[in-house]
Amino acid sequence: MDLFDKLKELHEQGLAEIKKATDEQTLNKIRVELVGRKGELTKILHSMRDVAPENRREVGQKVNELRDLFNKQLDTTKAKIVKAVLAKKLEDEKIDVTLPGREGHLGSKHPINIILDDLESYFIGMGYKVVQGPEIETDHYCFEMMNLPKDHPARDMQATFYIDGEDLLRTQTSGDQARVLEKHDFSKSPLKMVGPGKVYRRDDDDATHSHQFMQMEGLVVDKNVTMSDLKGTLEMIAKHVFGQDRATRLRPSYFPFTEPSVEMDVSCFNCDGKGCPICKYTGWIEVLGAGMVHPNVLENAGVDSTVYGGFAFGLGLDRFAILKYGIDDIRDFYTNDVRFLKQFRKEEN
């Protein structure tokens, strides 16, 4: 069989094979066999040395024509296959737009974040700035700057997670006060700040205790700040969070960084001050601690305590949420139970 007959036979067989192909994988295999570097047309070109010189040009021309024909048919067939595959996929995956839609499952804010966002907005409206301090704190800022030197017996009041040397997981957000006091320029303005954040204590987790909880520290420092200013501020906080009908009272207490120190109670939510098991028959529930800033705290930060004074308060956001929403177990905040969390969606606004 001469090359002309071989080209004619390859022409017929090649077109037939291309026509039978039903998928891209088969088509690619045919392309390699016909026009690839080691395909049939390439083999014919390699055998041109056996062709008479006067016929070589004609054979080469027919090989090129056949290659162009095969490539054109291969491309056309591939386009048809791709179109057919896409049409089938669209048919299989088509959407019936007349079907009813599925309602999306919306999340909600965590109850502690609801309290936090509400209080931050409240204090910003009263001219306070919000400060974020480090959770990994130094002994210097967490204790010493807050009038708790290394030999102070009040350190035993807080079981601390020490990391190494001077570094620890902060037991209170009071360190934020010291950092801001050091940098604040009192010649320009008074200092009014709140510092929310996570704090850590070496407590055994139970219904009322957690090794990690949220706290918010507040601080006001200026000339002529009095206990009356503190009392009025605390009453406004309590009534804002727990309702205007809540009665409040202050009791003497002790904190190393304030003098005098007080704790604030609100009338019991359950019995309205009459006495019940929840308030231990006192009619009152403790909500936060506060006091006038100790002169040592001011002096440690380089603030003249004979000119400036102020008040500070610290409240537990977890405790506020427990009291406001009537939650029995603090661990409910951290177990990620959607059934528990979604009931606070109505509180977000």
UniProtKB/Swiss-Prot annotation:
Disulfide bonds: none annotated. Gene3D superfamilies: Bira Bifunctional Protein, Domain 2. It is found in: Cytoplasm. Binds 2 magnesium ions per tetramer. It is an enzyme of class 6 (ligase). Its cofactor is Mg(2+). Its main location: cytoplasm. It comes from the Bacteria. GO terms for cellular component: cytoplasm. Mg(2+) binds at E259. The keyword Transport does not apply. Its EC number is 6.1.1.20. GO terms for biological process: phenylalanyl-tRNA aminoacylation. One of its GO terms (molecular function) is magnesium ion binding. Keywords: Aminoacyl-tRNA synthetase, ATP-binding, Cytoplasm, Ligase, Magnesium, Metal-binding, Nucleotide-binding, Protein biosynthesis. It catalyses: tRNA(Phe) + L-phenylalanine + ATP = L-phenylalanyl-tRNA(Phe) + AMP + diphosphate + H(+). Belongs to the class-II aminoacyl-tRNA synthetase family. Phe-tRNA synthetase alpha subunit type 1 subfamily. Tetramer of two alpha and two beta subunits. NCBIfam families: pheS (TIGR00468). PANTHER family: PHENYLALANINE--TRNA LIGASE, MITOCHONDRIAL, PHENYLALANYL-TRNA SYNTHETASE. This is Phenylalanine--tRNA ligase alpha subunit. The gene is pheS.
